[in-house]
Amino acid sequence: MMKLVLFSVIVILFSLIGSIHGADVPGNYPLDRSGKKYPCTITWKKNPSCIQICKKHGVKYGYCFDFQCWCEIFGRLKTFKI
């Protein structure tokens, strides 16, 4: 009985650790024609210019991260220059 309780506590702790970190959403920085990342000045989740840039690259959502536009679910295979 004690082993079952201990096992249950361990499983609960590991599941809590996983939920704290959450799942990382894959993404990438889109590149312009010269191969550079698109700059942005306002780092917040709903940056209209970054969303527009990401839509041009075929991605539904993007935001400003570290003063550069970041597109979610944008892998290396989809990286192209417009």
From Swiss-Prot:
Please provide, alphabetically and separated by semicolons, the GO molecular function terms listed in this UniProt record: ion channel inhibitor activity; sodium channel inhibitor activity; toxin activity
Q: What is the protein name stated in its UniProt record?
A: Beta-insect toxin AaBTxL1
Q: What is known of its domains?
A: Has the structural arrangement of an alpha-helix connected to antiparallel beta-sheets by disulfide bonds (CS-alpha/beta).
Domain (LCN-type CS-alpha/beta): residue spans on this chain: 25-82
Quote the record's miscellaneous comment: Negative results: is totally devoid of toxicity when intracerebroventricularly injected into mice and does not compete with radiolabeled voltage-gated potassium and sodium channel toxins in binding experiments on rat brain synaptosomes.
Q: Which family does it belong to?
A: Belongs to the long (3 C-C) scorpion toxin superfamily. Sodium channel inhibitor family. Beta subfamily.
Keywords, in A-Z order = Disulfide bond, Ion channel impairing toxin, Neurotoxin, Secreted, Signal, Toxin, Voltage-gated sodium channel impairing toxin
Give the subcellular location: Secreted
What role does it play? Shifts the voltage of activation of para/tipE voltage-dependent sodium channels (Nav) toward more negative potentials.
Q: What is its main location?
A: secreted
Q: Which CDD domains match?
A: neurotoxins_LC_scorpion (cd23106)
SUPFAM superfamilies xrefs: Scorpion toxin-like
InterPro entries assigned: LCN-type_CS_alpha_beta_dom, Scorpion_toxin-like_sf, Scorpion_toxinL/defensin
Taxonomic lineage:
Eukaryota, Metazoa, Ecdysozoa, Arthropoda, Chelicerata
- Which tissues carry this protein? Expressed by the venom gland.
The stretch of residues making up the signal peptide is 1-22
Asked if the Swiss-Prot or TrEMBL record annotates the protein with the keyword Transmembrane, the reply is no
- The yes or no answer to whether the keyword rRNA-binding is present is no
* Protein's organism: Androctonus australis
Q: Name one GO cellular component term.
A: extracellular region
Superkingdom of the source species? Eukaryota
Q: Which cysteines are joined by disulfide bonds?
A: 40-64, 50-69, 54-71
